[in-house]
Amino acid sequence: MQYLILREDDIYLFLNNGVIKELSLGMDKHQIINLFERPNNYEPQRKFKKEIMGYGGLNIYLLDGLVKYFSMSALNNETSNINFEGISKDCILRYADAHNLSIKKLFEFDDVEYFQMDNIKLGFLEDALIYISVGM
């Protein structure tokens, strides 16, 4: 399983175009396997249930072989291979303001504050970024 280190520049690119570490919506299953190898956890598509490729803290959801949404979380230390390198909520909010990106607070759950920018969601624990998703 790959260990993903996400820095400020990676997050800024993600906020601008939804791409992070070469992963984006619309990619096909073979591109995902070429990028991350075979998943540790896998659930095939069944009727209306999406196919899930799980790589520790990275979950990729596909429908008819194409990425429909994905999430990255550093919440679970035992399974997480995701490291958000000290990216603060203030840093993200300043970036959004400077680039006229609309961001709104959604809710708080288990001490995590969730924000949304278009179809991108961000989660902060004690003002540190710990969760991102797109398409969900």
Where are these predicted regions, by residue range?
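Short helix/turn-capping signatures at newly exposed starts of structured segments
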Residues: 1-136
